[in-house]
Amino acid sequence: MTDPKTSKEQKYDRQLRLWGDHGQEALENAHVCLINATASGTEILKNLVLPGIGAFTIVDGHKVSGEDVGNNFFLSSSAIGKNRAQAATELLQELNSDVSGNFVEESPDKLLDNDCEFFHRFSLVIAVQLPESTCLRLGAVLWEAGVPFLVCRTYGLIGYMRLIVKEHTVVESHPDNALEDLRLDQPFTELKRHVESYDLDNMEKKDHSHTPWIIVVARYLEKWYNENNSQLPKNYKEKEAFRQLLREGILKNENGGLEDEENFEEAIKNVNTALNPTKISSGTQDIFNAEQCENITSQSSSFWVMAHGVRDFVQNEGNGNLPVRGSIPDMIADSDKFIKLQNVYRDKAMRDAAVVSKHVEMLLQSVGKTPESISEQEIKLFCKNAAFLRVVRCRSLADEYSVDTFNKDEITSCMDSPDSEMVLYLMLRSVDRFYQQHSRYPGVYNYQVEEDINKLKLCVNSLLQEYSLNVNVKDDYIHEFCRYGAAEPHTVAAFLGGSAAQEAIKIITHQFVPFNNTFLYNAMSQTSATFQL
């Protein structure tokens, strides 16, 4: 009989490499609410059901129409006349037996009228193709409850996403091109001792050629310090001189030529990395200085408790530095030397994490919580990623839509270029205005397209006037949006479905950094942009 754990590892192999067991566990404990099972909505859920989201609930009061069947792969003609939430749930559940699917045959407006607390239970609410008025109502309820809200929309060849979350903390941000944490400029005692155990001047050739480049750089730094008042090589000229010092250390053969020592070549190549000063990034420093980090209460999340614990470590045992990360890059070296060096860093990281753990324990006790409420594993992970912590704070929809608090500067500066994706945002706001006035979107009926162009132009002008925006929207965009007729082409819905599911997974797992706060995709020009609105 197959071990269920092994079978799960095989099933989710690729994604486990991305976000690990703990990320998968967060996904499997999540309950996502989708409002409206349109083409975009079912595409988003498909991309959450396949990786194994714990549960989903679809809220949709609409019946399946011929139009739905025409653009939605998850609805068949036999479903016409049935409730759309029910029909989509049945087919989506077939994708993954591990996932629990539920549906509510009611409009979000009715739920907001009768039981707005219904939405409090979810890990994330995703609203698709929702009218502006409902979106604002639901946004206010979720903002108050602290539930993350993702608004998605496909409008013709335009894709739109808006993330609304008061505070989202990220421990594992997985940054690209992260610098190694080697501490060669400020070596800790055990590293110093380990480096000193290597005598490069009196070594067999084989050992000399298989000494890790970190050791090579550290030993030659000592020589550099002796000649340069213990100052690190800082500028290009000094670093080039240091590289030359390393080149001179390469062994010579009996003919006086240089031996082929790849470890020294690695050392020369990695001079910039190795000599990067050990310091705390401004982003991490901002987190340490935040009020939430300063004032820990029994309501504080584990992120802020651990941030305070790391800050205490920095101010005391760390002598101004973060806990050692504990990892080193692959390099040319024999296994024994590499493992010994790796263990020096790893052991130091574990000792630092243990000290942070003590700070966290004392902190938890001071606010009346048990030390077990944050596990050792969580603290180790936090210490390992302390240099890459992120906090994302989005503005509320109410602030974005209010004439007093909307982001005028962002809109105006972007509209200096009349074909900026910002014009798509203004057009989406304008078609919503059209809907409020006419209870339909422009161009939905072919015979009204010409007439709707003028009506939509009035809506664009009234929007710009109301918000005192002195910008120009080309007539081409007004014509284009009328031609869209609020259609939801599957190609755009599929792209949006993949993008939105990716952001949803970031929110649920607290890994990778979500966008802040508005994303626009233009399928005509194959471009996209992110704005803070």
UniProtKB/Swiss-Prot annotation:
The keyword Thylakoid does not apply. Keywords: Ubl conjugation pathway. InterPro entries: APP-BP1 (IPR030667), ThiF/MoeB/HesA (IPR045886), ThiF_NAD_FAD-bd (IPR000594), Ubiquitin-activating_enz (IPR035985). Residues 330-343 are annotated as: Interaction with uba3. Heterodimer of uba3 and nae1. The complex binds nedd8 and ube2m. This is NEDD8-activating enzyme E1 regulatory subunit. Regulatory subunit of the dimeric uba3-nae1 E1 enzyme. E1 activates nedd8 by first adenylating its C-terminal glycine residue with ATP, thereafter linking this residue to the side chain of the catalytic cysteine, yielding a nedd8-uba3 thioester and free AMP. E1 finally transfers nedd8 to the catalytic cysteine of ube2m. The covalent attachment of nedd8 to target proteins is known as 'neddylation' and the process is involved in the regulation of cell growth, viability and development. It comes from the Eukaryota. The record marks 210 as: Interaction with uba3. It comes from Danio rerio (Zebrafish). Pathway: Protein modification; protein neddylation. One of its GO terms (molecular function) is NEDD8 activating enzyme activity. It holds the Pfam family ThiF. Belongs to the ubiquitin-activating E1 family. ULA1 subfamily. GO terms for biological process: protein neddylation.
